[in-house]
Structure formats: structure tokens, C-alpha cells
């Protein structure tokens, strides 16, 4: 007997539906005899397996500690791989500054705020080097990742904006603290500059590194070329660092310049470290703590906003 292909397909479809109904009936009758607690457990396990397989679901708690630490460790290893540039170079630059000022000014330079000029100069050079290195760490990392096109390797992992900022800032703080320790040891050995209030030194070095690390993130995100990043560093960061009382006391400035200096957060970072190292300063360290802390909050807020929205990162 000749059977059409359409009739064969209809027969196969009817048989498939019949088998499916029978299988479902067996499954329902089999599960019906199970206790209610077992049924609830099976349903809960099925729900968990479904949720665990969904894309984009965080499965490691409220904070991705492992991811944050991994990003921070990557930033630390990045500058430690070139330790001759990140550790030795700042020490040599600080030594050159002290040597040049010693030769150029000589012993005829009087005391500044009751201490020898070289002793007064050491905390300023230490702090200036710290803030420059903290800025360079985050800015160069983000800018190079954007320009080379591998920023996606940082944005793709399940890290929130807060975790990304903490990871990058942690690397900047580590670099700033390492540079501070190296220069402080050199100052103690060659100039005899000790620590009058070590806690203040630690506080302002950490706050200065956080502030400059955040500014470095902003610069790295904003810059699309290394030329733009260099312009930000040369025309904004370096002048603010040099005009913040690094080499002088602001008491020698005209009143107008003193007012401008007091509006500069970098001044309070340098002044706070100077107070902690040699016990003299142009302003109260408590005022500096408030100003630098407020500046850190503002800068970190901008970093979080840009990381959360992907400004100039995802476009």
C-alpha cells in the first residue's frame, strides 16, 4: 500500500505525543507518593541550580574579596616588576634634589621655621615623590589598558565599581607607602631626620596616596592618549606639587599666595608629613586632616561614578 509522506509524519507525531503523555503521567504518579518535605527539597534544589546557571549572577557573597585582592595584587606586581623605576628612581631623584639645593644654597641659608633648611626640605621632597608615584601608578595603568585595548580584561570579571576602585587605589597606596619608607630611611641615614609624630606621617602618606591615586584614576579614564595624560601631569599635578610648600614655608609668601596655598589640598598633605617628621608646620594637622579627607571623598566619588557608568571606558 502506498502511504504518503504527510500521513507518515502525522502518525509519528501522534505516537510521540502519546509517549510524552505516558512519561509525564508516570513521573507525576511517581512523585505523588513522595513526602511533602522531599518534594519541597527537590523543588528548592532545582531552583538553586537554575539560579546558579544564570548569566551575571554573583555567587561569592556581597563582596568579591578574591577579585579585589587579585586586582590589587596585579597593580602591585605591575610596578614591582620594574622596581628600578618605581623604587630606586624616586630615591635617586630625592637625593639629587637635596644635593642640588645643598650646592646651590650652601651653608649661608638660614634656618626655616627654626630648623636647618635641609631638614626642612626632606619631608617636602618625600611627600612630593609619594604623590607623584601614586598618581603615576593608577593613571598609567588605566591609560595603557585603554590605549592597548585590554581594559576589557578588567571590566569583564564580576567586580563592582567599589571593588574596582579599591583594587586600583590599593596599588597606588602600596607604591606610595613603599617610596615613602625608602626615602624616610635615606633621610634618617644621611640627614638624621627622624620622626617626631610617626602616626601623623602614616596618616598623611596614606591619605595623600589615596587622593593622588584617585586623581590618577580620573586622569587615566579621561585621557585617550598618552599625550593627554602627560599634559595633565605636567600642567596640573607637577605645578600643584611644587607650589604646595615643598621647598619653602608659605609664611614667606604674600597674603594672596598664602590664601591660594591654603586652598590647595597638596599643601596640607606636605604640611602634615612635615609636622610628623620634624614637628613644625604652617597649619594645624587637624585642619589638614579634614581638608585632605574631604578631598579624598570628592575624588573617590568621581571615580566610583565614572566606573559605575563606564565613562570613556566602554565607548
Please describe what each predicted stretch is.
Residues 2, 19, 33-36:
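Compositionally biased, low-complexity segments
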Residues 2-5, 262:
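Histidine (H) residue identity feature
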Residues 4, 9-10, 14-18, 29:
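Basic polycationic patches enriched in arginine
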Residues 10, 27, 41-44:
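Low-complexity, intrinsically disordered segments with a bias for serine/threonine
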Residues 16, 35-198, 203-315:
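Hydrophobic transmembrane alpha-helices and immediately adjacent juxtamembrane helices
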